[in-house]
Amino acid sequence: MSFEKLGEDGKARRGRLTFPRGVVETPAFMPVGTYGTVKGMLPRDIEEIGAHIILGNTFHLMLRPGTEVVKAHGDLHDFTQWQGPILTDSGGFQVFSLGEMRKITEQGVTFRSPVDGSKVELSPEIAIQVQRDLGSDIVMIFDECTPYPATEKQAKESMELSLRWAERSKRAHEGNPAALFGIVQGGMYESLRDQSLEGLEKIGFDGYAIGGLSVGEPKEDMIRILDHLPPKMPEDKPRYLMGVGRPEDIVEAVRRGVDMFDCVMPTRNARNGYLFTSAGIVKIRNAKNRHDTGPLDERCDCYTCKHFSKSYLHHLDKCGEMLGSQLNTIHNLRFYQNLMSGLRGAIEAGTLSDFVSEFYALRGETVPPLGDS
């Protein structure tokens, strides 16, 4: 993988990731295909909505179907028939989500499989090997996602453990041509974030991710870390904000210099009839949509908006028809890709401020201030 920075507007960056399997323009949003599928989407649908990279999950794919099944097809690309680049999360966040069901030691984590209750071990070496077996194009180190809230002492111990695991991840990755990304931890403490970043840079990675955000903290804390951290991250490497996915949060992170994003929000919300539009959220199951013959979003060029009315989408939702979830997902993911395309174009043209102003004005909101970092 190579990363080329093509332009800037303020702190925002316009870039390009080049892989043997394809090119990804940044800022980029990666649809999440946890089990090897972006729910409700065929691979050709993902291409048509404009995504060029997707995310898979090491934790879930390791448990089901297992790497031996995937490897029998070749790799995850062959198994899923998605031939573009794939980033795989190492499983650290999913282990964090298990709460009291898991035990963390210096070696790694042991837990009971949510699939069949069997005892499972996950360590830096295992996580990296699983991602090698999957044929990931971007491999994530195995880390501990610092919980919120955490005292400074707890956050420091967690961050230092993640740094030790980062070294082991780097060693385990040797000989794999795929990119390897480090993950900055440290909770809500700027000084710990700095220590984590410094330690990761000494080890050396192909890209750097910001982990441990969108884990329950107030939005002002997330913005405070985003004001502080991205400007300190390597200029010549991609910056990836993990699991943060509200459109406004993506806009604010891009303004602060972040390049890559993923979140289940557009797909999960689509299945629940919670749709993103240029004017804000549309809850399609609300009664007011029953007789609305207009499109979901007049500014959207997706298949759903070009062919179907809000009334029809409301009808599908009320009937529990699977087509409703599919059409909603196509729209939400296309909305996100259009947002990223708009951000890229604005950075190129030096008009990001105007783009951001219009983004908030259409929602009836004012532009939040940028920090001074």
Curated annotation (Swiss-Prot):
Belongs to the queuine tRNA-ribosyltransferase family. The keyword Transferase applies. One of its GO terms (cellular component) is cytosol. Substrate binds at D89, S90, G91, G92, F93, D143, Q185, G212. This is Queuine tRNA-ribosyltransferase. GO terms for molecular function: metal ion binding; tRNA-guanosine(34) queuine transglycosylase activity. SUPFAM superfamilies: tRNA-guanine transglycosylase. Residues 243-249, 267-271 are annotated as: RNA binding. GO terms for biological process: queuosine biosynthetic process; tRNA wobble guanine modification; tRNA-guanine transglycosylation. The active site is at D89 (proton acceptor), D262 (nucleophile). Its cofactor is Zn(2+). Zn(2+) binds at C300, C302, C305, H331. PANTHER family: QUEUINE TRNA-RIBOSYLTRANSFERASE (PTHR46499:SF1). NCBIfam families: Q_tRNA_tgt (TIGR00430), tgt_general (TIGR00449). Pathway: tRNA modification; tRNA-queuosine biosynthesis. It catalyses: 7-aminomethyl-7-carbaguanine + guanosine(34) in tRNA = 7-aminomethyl-7-carbaguanosine(34) in tRNA + guanine. Its EC number is 2.4.2.29. Keywords: Glycosyltransferase, Metal-binding, Queuosine biosynthesis, Transferase, tRNA processing, Zinc. Binds 1 zinc ion per subunit. It comes from Marinobacter nauticus (strain ATCC 700491 / DSM 11845 / VT8). It comes from the Bacteria. Catalyzes the base-exchange of a guanine (G) residue with the queuine precursor 7-aminomethyl-7-deazaguanine (PreQ1) at position 34 (anticodon wobble position) in tRNAs with GU(N) anticodons (tRNA-Asp, -Asn, -His and -Tyr). Catalysis occurs through a double-displacement mechanism. The nucleophile active site attacks the C1' of nucleotide 34 to detach the guanine base from the RNA, forming a covalent enzyme-RNA intermediate. The proton acceptor active site deprotonates the incoming PreQ1, allowing a nucleophilic attack on the C1' of the ribose to form the product. Homodimer. Within each dimer, one monomer is responsible for RNA recognition and catalysis, while the other monomer binds to the replacement base PreQ1.
